[in-house]
């Protein structure tokens, strides 16, 4: 064997001996610990047996033996030091945390202060004071946190707060602006209503004094401009401006109607306003519009507008639909003989009335138009099923259809031919 191999074998033997010695030591320590625990358990059992007195031994004692007992003569063991007598050890603090720890005892003292019991009012005051103190303490904590932050973090936090303040929605401002606009619209409409009422009263006074009533005409452009604003429709109806419109459309004291410009403008405005039944009940404008449909003084186009308004406003009252399909039309069967006899009778009555009136007045009578609006529809006598069957059975290849097809075929053949002369000389 070489010297190197011998050295390696010696090293391996030394390592194995060291490991065996360590194992023996660990086993010895385990045995010693087990012996100690057994001895401790035996001592505790002996003490318990010594302290365990039976009831018979205690009953044999005589109480008279302890009459002249003096406790001062008995030797006492030295009192064991309590926890409060133990020395205190303070941990070394860093200079950065000293300021934080100095503020803690102040807060603890504030919380440990006893509070006096008072009545209900004083308790509420105390609660408010406590809340204020807590808010102040929170603000102080925030300030201390800001001081402790690094300058870079503090600048970043301040920038974030500024961005949040800029991007915060301004709903309260928008709501306040909307309220201001609504208030301005209400003021404008109320002012206009009062001016219209005063103008109507002034024109009535001037007309009764036989003077020209021009107050409403002067104010008409302003009224027309305001009442035609679509965003003010609800405000106009809520503030009962229709009452002033009714006063403008009423006849004057001399029973004359207002100017034609006023009638035309206000009637057109009434057709565009979304008037409901409660608005008609409050303003009573339906009566004056109905008067325009009955009276003979208004112009025909004014009467037509009034008729349309009355029919539109009366539908919800009488519960009638505005759809033409839902309209109930009376139907009657047509009898030619009855129609001829009735027509002859009506013509004879009309001629006799015209002759009597002409003889009475001594002049000719102007013919007038007759109302051609019918209230009763004729009954349909055709059978739709028979018409469809006859149409299907009718032959499609009739003489007229054949001629039409031939004509169309000739037109197509002419259009398909190329214009110009061919190479062979065709088309010359």
UniProtKB/Swiss-Prot annotation:
Domain TFIIS N-terminal: 243-320
Compositional bias of kind Basic and acidic residues: 16-41, 70-79
Disordered: region residues: 1-126, 346-365, 408-428
An annotated GO cellular component: nucleus
Biological process terms in GO annotation: poly(A)+ mRNA export from nucleus
Record's signal peptide: none
Top-rank taxon, per record: Eukaryota
Chief place of localization: nucleus
Subcellular location: Nucleus
Keywords: Coiled coil, Nucleus, Transcription, Transcription regulation
Recorded coiled-coil stretches: 2-65
Recorded family membership: Belongs to the IWS1 family.
Name listed for the protein in its UniProt record: Transcription factor iws1
Organism: Schizosaccharomyces pombe (strain 972 / ATCC 24843) (Fission yeast)
Gene label: iws1
């Amino acid at each position: 064997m070489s010297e190197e191999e011998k050295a390696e074998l010696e090293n391996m033997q030394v390592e194995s001996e060291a490991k065996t010695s360590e194992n023996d030591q660990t086993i010895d320590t385990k045995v010693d610990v087990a012996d100690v625990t057994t001895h401790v358990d035996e001592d505790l059992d002996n003490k318990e047996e010594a302290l365990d007195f039976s009831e018979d031994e205690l009953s044999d004692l005589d109480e008279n033996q302890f009459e002249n007992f003096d406790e001062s003569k008995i030797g006492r063991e030295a009192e064991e030091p309590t926890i409060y007598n133990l020395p205190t050890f303070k941990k070394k603090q860093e200079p950065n945390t000293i300021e934080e720890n100095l503020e803690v005892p102040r807060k603890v003292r504030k919380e440990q202060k006893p509070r006096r019991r008072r009545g209900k009012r004083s308790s509420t005051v105390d609660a408010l004071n406590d809340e204020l103190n807590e808010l102040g303490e929170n603000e102080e904590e925030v300030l201390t946190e800001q001081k402790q932050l690094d300058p870079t973090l503090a600048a970043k936090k301040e920038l974030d707060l500024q961005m949040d303040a800029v991007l915060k929605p301004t709903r309260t401002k928008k709501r306040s602006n909307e309220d201001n606009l609504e208030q301005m619209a209400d003021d404008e409409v109320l002012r206009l209503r009062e001016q219209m009422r005063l103008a109507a009263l002034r024109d009535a006074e001037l007309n009764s004094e036989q003077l020209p009533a021009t107050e409403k005409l002067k104010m008409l452009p302003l009224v027309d401009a305001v009442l035609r604003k679509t965003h003010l429709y609800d405000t106009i109806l809520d503030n009962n401006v229709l009452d002033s419109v009714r006063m403008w459309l009423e006849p004057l004291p001399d029973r004359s109607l207002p100017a034609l410009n006023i009638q035309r403008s206000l009637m057109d405005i009434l057709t565009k306003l979304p008037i409901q039944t409660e608005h008609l009940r409050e303003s009573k404008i339906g009566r004056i519009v109905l008067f325009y449909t009955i009276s003979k003084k208004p112009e025909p186009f004014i009467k037509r507008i009034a008729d349309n308004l009355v029919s539109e406003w009366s539908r919800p009252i009488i519960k009638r639909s505005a759809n033409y399909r839902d309209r109930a039309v009376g139907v009657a069967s047509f009898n030619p003989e009855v129609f001829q006899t009735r027509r002859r009778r009506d013509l004879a009555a009309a001629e006799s009335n015209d002759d009597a009136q002409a003889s009475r007045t001594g002049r000719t009578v102007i013919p007038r138009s007759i109302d051609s609006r019918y209230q009763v529809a004729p009954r349909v006598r055709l059978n739709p099923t028979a018409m469809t069957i006859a149409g299907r059975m009718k032959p499609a290849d009739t003489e007229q259809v054949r001629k039409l097809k031939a004509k169309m075929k000739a037109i197509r053949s002419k259009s398909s031919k190329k214009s110009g002369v061919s190479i062979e000389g065709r088309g010359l």
